[in-house]
Amino acid sequence: MDLQKACDRISQEFETDIIMGANLLVQMIQSQRITSNTPVQTVQPVQPVQPVQSVQSVQSVQSVQSVQPVQPVQPVQPVQPVRVPEINPVLFSYLIPLIPFIQMYHIAQKDVVPKNPQVQKQDVSQFTPDGKFKIPINKTKTIKKSTSEKKTSPKKKTTSQQIKRVRLSDEERNILESQYSKNNFPSPEIRDELAKKIGKTPRQVQIWFQNKRCKDRKNLEKNN
């Protein structure tokens, strides 16, 4: 309100001063003698200045909320690279073909549930010298209640491990020896035919030929 009153007062004083100065200037021009031939035009009185509009009150500025200080960013620690152990390429080349067999072996072991809790299955899996996988052999091992029973009871071989010796008659032996004289390494087809003739399995015929070759080799080395 004080600012508005001051503005009104200044505008009124300024207006009166302008009007008085303009009237004084008109009187001086009219009273002065001009020697020139051109008539002096009368100066029109100055129109009063319009009053200045009052300045609108400035709205109060809202108080600015204090800004919280920004927390400093912690430096990110570098991640240590994970070191992968080196694999021997030769060993890795042998392990690649064995992956399906190992998976099948573990799946089969999960499915097997022993009926007798006193019987444990011992799986024997070996690798041959050339890197091939040997078929695992399941052996049953009975848990003994005392160590004395282990010493007294000898271990017996299962029927699968026992080698059955097959005795051949003279006629069957003559058939195999006649073929051996012709070819001591018969093909699978010939072994099947011989097995049908003598009433044996092809595997038994193959074992007979192997034993016969081994026996002849030993006799030859002994004579030399």
From Swiss-Prot:
Disulfide bonds: none
UniProt entry tagged with the keyword DNA-binding: yes
Molecular-function annotations in GO: RNA polymerase II cis-regulatory region sequence-specific DNA binding
Record region (Disordered): 139-162
PROSITE patterns membership: HOMEOBOX_2
Localisation: Host nucleus
Gene Ontology BP, a term: regulation of transcription by RNA polymerase II
Name of the protein in question: Putative homeobox protein R749
